[in-house]
Swiss-Prot record:
Name of this chain's protein: Large ribosomal subunit protein bL32
Native species: Photorhabdus laumondii subsp. laumondii (strain DSM 15139 / CIP 105565 / TT01)
Keywords: Ribonucleoprotein, Ribosomal protein
GO cellular component: large ribosomal subunit
SUPFAM superfamilies membership: Zn-binding ribosomal proteins (SSF57829)
PANTHER family in alphabetical order: 50S RIBOSOMAL PROTEIN L32 (PTHR35534), LARGE RIBOSOMAL SUBUNIT PROTEIN BL32 (PTHR35534:SF1)
Length: 56
């Protein structure tokens, strides 16, 4: 089993954790329906960038 030889410093620990922060999802409002959706995704009613792309 691997065992560390030296204790990692607070600085090294912080540098390792610098990429662990969570980000909120980016939301957009559709031009035609005004519906909120994830960026670069189709809305629930089938619109993407103001165009109907999925027929239900």
């Amino acid at each position: 089993m691997a065992v560390q030889q030296n204790k990692p410093t607070r600085s090294k620990r912080g540098m390792r954790r610098s990429h662990d922060a969570l980000t909120a999802p980016l939301l957009s409002v559709d031009k035609t329906s005004g519906e909120t959706h994830l960026r670069h995704h189709v809305t629930a009613d089938g619109y993407y960038r103001g165009r109907k792309v999925i027929n239900k």
